[in-house]
Amino acid sequence: MKLKEDASTEKLRGGYYTPLSLAKFIVNWGVTNQVSSILEPSCGDGAFLEALKKSSGNFECTAVEVLDSEAEKSEMLVQNDLRFKVINNDFYDEYKNHLSDKTFDLVIGNPPYIRYQYLTEEQREEQSLIMTSNGLAANKLINAWVSFVVASVQLLSGNGKVGLVIPAELLQVKYAEKLRMYLMTHLQKITIVTFRELVFPDVQQEVVILMGEKDTFHEGVHQIKILEFDNIDDLNSNFHPVEERVAFKDIDMSTTKWTRYFLSKEQNALINKIKNDRRFVPFVEIGEVDIGITTGNNNFFSVNKDTVEDYDLGDVTLPLIARSVNIPGITFNEPDWIQNVEAGAKTYLLDFNNVSEAEMTVGQKKYIAEGEEREEHTGYKCSIRNKWYCVPSIWSPDAFFLRRNHLYPKFVLNNVPEAVSTDTMHRIRFPMFTDR
């Protein structure tokens, strides 16, 4: 994890700018004759404004940007076009003081992806205000994009539309569960566009497009559909035929899981049939599944053989599987680990939990001290520990579950005593006396 002072401007602002072709798609979808007011809450260098400028619509657009240089670029893009007003300010501050009592027919943009620890104290308070005022809990796991989405939906007019480029985490992570329920409740129709290829390859961040429609006078069930395309070109070329072919599905308000909406009616029927078949059992009846070890700084806590020898770390290390490529088969055995060690891979995890400072060797103390000199301990996870170098929840599992493993997930039996993994994979513990 980078320190705040060392993090890039993109990370601190959370800005990885939207390709113009994608901005044009969202604008073309969102702008209609009924749209008279538009909000762009984080306009960056103005991709959405450039797309909007080419529209002949009679609207007023309010655009907000926190960085002076980017706000200036956006201002230059729309100069002399009286439909636009660019505000150089933090959206949180603008929301609190000027926007919270307004509504817009269309909200579009690419909200910033900023982790909680990169927010200022004032931003954290304002983010919390957005969440709690909309009936959602605020916590330290919530990324800035979540609060931007909530605010965007809140600011919609009675028949407003929202079109946002957001992380695919919306579909996957636990901390987005409440957000999914919020969207299901407040939007009458939701279309999610996913991509097989990366839209932002430089940051390896999967994104989706949230296209939501509000209808205050709507009665009946809310609906959702999920569409998949190869890339932006495929989206622009084939959106309408794909969109017409995929029907909306009624939203089940009793669950926040959206997996079923990816599947066809026949596929969902098959899954329900399997659930009711006594030959199958839920995995929870077989074993306990937990995320791998979250070190807070894999670069510091995961080391290779040379580092172990240089700093006398042998007594405070455990065998480590750091990456899925370190496990070629469906079992992890001693020869596999030794092969990884000899290949120079980071195959040791540091565990200082069972050694006091007085018991540490000179080399071990030196390794920690050099880490502190490099400020390895200032990341969020490390900084909240009593002893930053003592990683919690270290235990060796019976098996590993590799959820992101090339073409398919993989279940690997662990035959190496004390072997552990980082949070790149899940770990599984069987009940006592289970015949593995």
Regions found by a protein language model. Give the residues of each.
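Alpha-helical interaction/dimerization surfaces of two-component signaling modules
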Residues: 55, 77-78
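Conserved acidic residues
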Residues: 36, 105, 398
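Glycine- and acidic
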Residues: 7-12, 133-135, 421-431
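Glycine-rich helix-loop-beta junction characteristic of Rossmann-like nucleotide cofactor-binding loops
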Residues: 28-33
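Signature of N6-adenine DNA methyltransferases within the class I
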Residues: 11-12, 17-25, 42-52, 56-60, ...
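N-terminal, positively charged/glycine-rich alpha-helical extensions of SAM-dependent methyltransferases
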Residues: 1-7
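Polybasic, glycine- and aromatic-enriched phosphate-binding surface used to engage nucleic acids
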Residues: 267-436
